[in-house]
Amino acid sequence: MCFLVSCSGNIPFSEDEKGALKKAKTEIAEMKKNPTMAEKERILQKGLEVQKKYLRIGVVYFKSVEKDIPMADYYLARNYSARGENEEALKWARKGSNRGVKEASAFAGHIYANQRDEMNARKYYIKAMDQGDYREDTLFRVWVYGERKEINSEVVEAFKRNLNKNIEVKNALAFYYQRHDYFDEAEKLYKELVNEKYPNAERLLGELYMSKKDYDKAEEWLLKESENLFSHSEDNVKRIEEKRARLLRLLAKVYEMKGDYGKAENNLLKAKELAHKELALTSLAKLYEKQGKYNQALKINDELEELKKTKKRKIKS
């Protein structure tokens, strides 16, 4: 345990840190007189609190209870990482991972990813998922570090192991299949998501059909999503408007590919009034150019330039 010198090289503790260290030693000694799990949990929480001000002192608290509380390994890993001691951080992250701490597994994956060690990054992100970490970021990184020209069987098997444990896994696997043009497998999973009332599942299925260039089915499913999206409201107005604008832009693309430029234009005009106006305007200008309507395209490009200038002025102010 580190006392009069810091845990980071040979930099001595400041007077304030020495005071915090003395208090930590006293509190830990008291805990050892009555070493119940409740007392050890209290020491762990105290370490989290103290490290906000005295980062290096947090280690003292965490190490005093880590044998009995595996989560302390994760906190030690985060603490060392925050001080730039990545090898020490990795040591504790791996230890926590081996003790079943999903947060530690994901953090080990994060460290390996930063070291550009993709194989180990994938290994630990998969381990985190197997331990029950179904956060969007973790699932995303499982398939990102499984990205190659060919689909990665290790990643597929990992997703399949967890397929019925969390619905987000099914969505992640469907997307992974779609990225590698395994359209039939992706379609099956997206249809299951539709039946399970997964949010935006109709849109996801519509986008899959766009990838397959089956624009009739894409239109069918995007319109089903439209019925849901435009028939209810959300407390977060900005969020619902962004969802609606995105759907309208997708429908516009489908209609453009089907040669129905009128419907494509109408959807883009609606989309630009909701959210991300610049995206709708950019698509609208291209649509007009495609039809040889160059004067209208120029007007839209002028509107787009003015929008960019307005945004720059807002940023400066």
Enumerate the predicted regions with their spans:
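Terminal, low-structured helical/coil segments at or just beyond the last alpha-helical repeat
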Residues: 242, 282-317
